[in-house]
Regions:
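Beta-sandwich interaction modules
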Residues: 122-151
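Extracellular/mature segments of secreted proteins
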Residues: 19, 55-62, 69-70, 127, ...
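Glycan-recognition and processing domains
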Residues: 19-57, 200-205
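Acidic, Ser/Thr/Pro-rich low-complexity intrinsically disordered segments
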Residues: 53-127
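C-terminal edge strands of extracellular/lumenal beta-sandwich accessory domains
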Residues: 16, 25-31, 110-112, 146-208
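Secretory targeting signatures
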Residues: 1-28
Length: 208
């Protein structure tokens, strides 16, 4: 009698375990964005010296920086967006001619791990929000590569810029040149319903 009850209890636990296993949702794959790298700058008064003046001794770009983003085989897209604000850029261009890229500019370059250029853009006037989407290296505009994905390794975002600011007694004459550049990738991410809350997942590259 005792043996029968014990056996029945063990069978009950096994059946409950199987039932619970059957009720679990299967893991699912999602494509999610990775935290972007951002380069943003607001120029201060006298930060960049106007070329041609007596005190001018700067390089052409008084802002220069680069950021690295790691790309692996799980990356499905690379996305970049940027904006540039140059007050009175059209007026300055008409007054000084077409060489305003020596005075005010933002140059954005995306480099592959081997140093080849994938994409670049030169802004010499204000630019509203613009975006670039790369689904593979075949979408590069300079050095086209792998059509089925991206080369693994460190991709580099380079930004060079020159801008100005003026704090005038009359507010309408004051201005601050500025820009913002963001680069990020989307990657495969696995959701395990039994351990992840809403919005959570584990990147597949971390499971390998």
């Amino acid at each position: 009698m005792l043996l029968s009850v014990a056996s029945s209890g063990c069978m009950g636990l096994a059946m409950q375990r199987e039932l619970m296993e059957g009720m679990r949702d299967d893991p699912r794959e999602e494509i999610v964005p990775v935290e972007p790298i951002v380069q943003a700058h607001i120029f201060a008064q006298n930060e960049c010296i106007l070329p041609g003046t007596e005190s001018y001794s700067q390089e052409t770009d008084c802002y220069s920086n680069e950021s690295v983003i790691l790309v692996d085989e799980t990356v499905s897209k690379m996305l970049l967006d940027f904006s540039v604000s140059f007050e009175w850029s059209s007026t300055v261009g008409e007054f000084l001619g077409n060489n305003t890229d020596e005075l005010r500019f933002v140059e954005i370059t995306l480099l592959k791990p081997n140093g080849d250029k994938c994409w670049e853009y030169l802004a010499t006037s204000s630019v509203g929000q613009m975006a670039l989407e790369l689904r593979s290296e075949s979408d590069c505009t300079i050095s086209i590569g792998n059509s089925s994905g991206f080369t693994n390794g460190n991709w580099v975002l380079q930004v060079r810029a020159r801008g100005y600011a003026l704090s005038a007694p009359i507010d309408t004459l004051s201005f601050e040149d500025e820009f913002r550049v963001s680069l990020w990738v989307t990657k495969k991410c696995i959701v395990f319903p039994e351990i992840h809350s809403d919005g959570e997942c584990t990147f597949s590259s971390e499971l390998e």
